[in-house]
Every structure is written in structure tokens, then in C-alpha cells.
Amino acid sequence: MYWEEIIELIKTLGNEPNSTFPNPYNESDEYEIYKYERGTLSTSYINIEEFSEEVKNILNKYLKYEPENFQLFCSLGASDGFGPHEDIGDTLIICIEGQISYIIENTKPVVLKSGDSILIAEGREHMGVSSTIPRICISCRVNRYVPSDEVTHYFG
């Protein structure tokens, strides 16, 4: 359902000239707008205004937590992902289509399906584990406290 909107967004981002530094939506010094690595397409940070109205409607519930640094992660099947890592700030991940699992530190994997979300507190090691089901996920940093009842899975 959301693939068409995401593909159009990726095409739009791909037509941009080389990113300039500093990029107001990207705190890193990377100039790549998106990259394809080990089966996963990921974008650099995207302004919320770049998303379609359908995707913005999904994000509306979380705007009160002041999200920023939106990134898309898409795969058409099983992929290796990016391995164990920690993020700066609390991370909110929303599965808008498909399915993905996350392993947080040494816990059992939790599965996110379409519409599910997960909050991972700053400093908690985690990694995504894709499945054979195509997926689209949005990741962002939140600047305000997110209560556990606002997300499907909570690792605060």
C-alpha cells in the first residue's frame, strides 16, 4: 500500500544535487542521500514534510514527542541489516508495511508487523533482523518521553 509513495519519495531524493554540508536534516557528515547495503535501502535524514500525506498520517500520533532525523529502511526480502549498534537519543521505529524483528541487547527477538512500533532507549544495543516479507520502516529520534502504552514494544 505504501510502496508507491516511498518509491516516489526515493526518486525525488535521488534527483537532488549532491547534499550540502551542513544539511539541516542530517547531523552526520555523510553526503549520500540514500544507500543500498546488504539488501536494505536506507535514506539519510528526511524532513517530515517530504513524506506523503498517507505516511504523515501514521506519524501524526507521535508528533507530540518531537521526532526528528527520520530515516526510511526498506527491503524486498531477507537482508543482513546493519548489525548490533546503539543510537544517540531514544529511537522510535514504526513498521508501516511488512515485518521485521528486533533484538534488544540479550532479549528474545520481538516482531514488528504493519502498524507496530518500538521504542529503544538511548544506549541500548539493538539490531534489526529482516524476514522474507518485504518491509518499510521509519526510524526517528524522539526528544520527549514516550510512555510505554504509546508503542507496541517498549525498551525504555
PLM regions: where:
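An N-terminal JmjN-like helical accessory module and its immediate linker preceding a catalytic domain
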Residues: 1-16
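Active-site region of the double-stranded beta-helix
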Residues: 16-116, 124-155
